[in-house]
């Protein structure tokens, strides 16, 4: 195993540990095996239990009802969370499953879903990324997608998730400039960088707990997904006896910072595949 492999595997271990410590310090369970019936139970007991569940649905029906009942207080980050999550899951399925293997796509999605259901997305993404980094070497990175379809797929993810990420932050920034006293639901301190104090604002403490856990999952899980793609890019370069340059790393970091981890991941894979495919075409 190369030095860069160790670096990216260590990064995934760091994200996994960071997610566990972060959740533990804020009172969320590290491992949870809730009853499946709680997905359809909207009783008060289930709603109370939902304050600590790690899965992004947190008893999906109850959580969505809680978000709806609390109006716009938690909508902005939820939209950001869903866009990044969907984009990264599609990228992971693209990387782990050859084109057209729908059953294997379902198996990979089910494995990631069960891990997230029991240990939370902030832990599941790093664990899943560790498996990918250990199983897929550079010579196996490019899937059987036709080149035109692959570029269209990655560019679609890049633009859709990137525009949503930038647009959501623009809404939060405008709301912050218009309401500097942090009383607006879309204020960046209430929506993206933190959660509102529901003892002072008209929102539910349970919904705030859900939102805080989504923020933990989004910050650690999506960072894990982005560095997974950077690790795969590094493997592809090593197969060509090349290494990541400082200029390329700075570019990848700023794309991820501005357009979001999902768009950053798509950009990394487009860059990687342009290198590996071009050599095959020349050969």
Swiss-Prot record:
Induction record: Expression is down-regulated when the stress-activated mitogen-activated protein kinase (sakA) is deleted.
Q: Where is the signal peptide?
A: 1-27
Write the record's keywords in alphabetical order, separated by commas.
Membrane, Signal, Transmembrane, Transmembrane helix
Function (record text): Part of the gene cluster that mediates the biosynthesis of lolitrems, indole-diterpene mycotoxins that are potent tremorgens in mammals, and are synthesized by clavicipitaceous fungal endophytes in association with their grass hosts. The geranylgeranyl diphosphate (GGPP) synthase ltmG is proposed to catalyze the first step in lolitrem biosynthesis. LtmG catalyzes a series of iterative condensations of isopentenyl diphosphate (IPP) with dimethylallyl diphosphate (DMAPP), geranyl diphosphate (GPP), and farnesyl diphosphate (FPP), to form GGPP.
Q: State its location(s).
A: Membrane
Is the keyword Transferase assigned to this protein? no
Q: Tell me the protein family, please.
A: Belongs to the ltmS family.
A GO CC annotation given for this chain: membrane
Q: How does it sit in the membrane?
A: Multi-pass membrane protein
The record lists the membrane-crossing segments as 73-93, 112-132, 157-177, 219-239, 250-270
Q: What is its main location?
A: membrane
The answer to whether UniProt assigns keyword Membrane to this entry is yes
Q: What is the protein name given in its UniProt record?
A: Lolitrem B biosynthesis cluster protein S
């Amino acid at each position: 195993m190369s030095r860069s492999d160790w670096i990216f595997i260590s990064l995934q271990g760091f994200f996994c540990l960071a997610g566990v410590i972060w959740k533990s310090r804020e009172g969320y369970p590290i491992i949870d095996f809730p009853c499946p019936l709680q997905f359809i139970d909207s009783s008060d007991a289930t709603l109370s239990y939902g304050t600590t569940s790690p899965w992004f649905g947190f008893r999906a029906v109850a959580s969505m009802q809680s978000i709806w009942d609390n109006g716009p207080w938690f909508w902005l980050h939820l939209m950001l969370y869903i866009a990044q999550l969907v984009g990264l899951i599609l990228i992971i399925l693209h990387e782990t499953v050859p084109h057209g293997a729908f059953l294997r796509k379902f198996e990979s999605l089910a494995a990631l879903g069960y891990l997230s259901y029991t240990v939370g997305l902030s832990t599941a993404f790093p664990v899943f990324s560790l498996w990918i980094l250990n199983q897929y070497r550079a010579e196996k990175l490019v899937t059987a997608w036709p080149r035109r379809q692959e570029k269209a797929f990655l560019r679609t993810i890049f633009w859709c998730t990137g525009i949503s990420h930038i647009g959501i932050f623009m809404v939060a920034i405008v709301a912050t400039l218009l309401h500097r006293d942090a009383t607006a639901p879309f204020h960046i301190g209430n929506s993206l960088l933190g959660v509102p104090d529901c003892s002072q604002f008209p929102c539910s403490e349970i919904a705030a707990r859900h939102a805080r856990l989504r923020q933990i999952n989004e910050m650690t899980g999506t960072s894990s997904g982005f560095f997974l793609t950077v690790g795969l890019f590094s493997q592809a370069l090593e197969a060509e006896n090349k290494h990541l340059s400082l200029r390329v790393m700075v570019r990848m970091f700023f794309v991820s910072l501005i357009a979001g981890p999902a768009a950053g991941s798509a950009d990394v894979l487009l860059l990687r595949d342009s290198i590996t495919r071009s050599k095959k075409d020349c050969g």
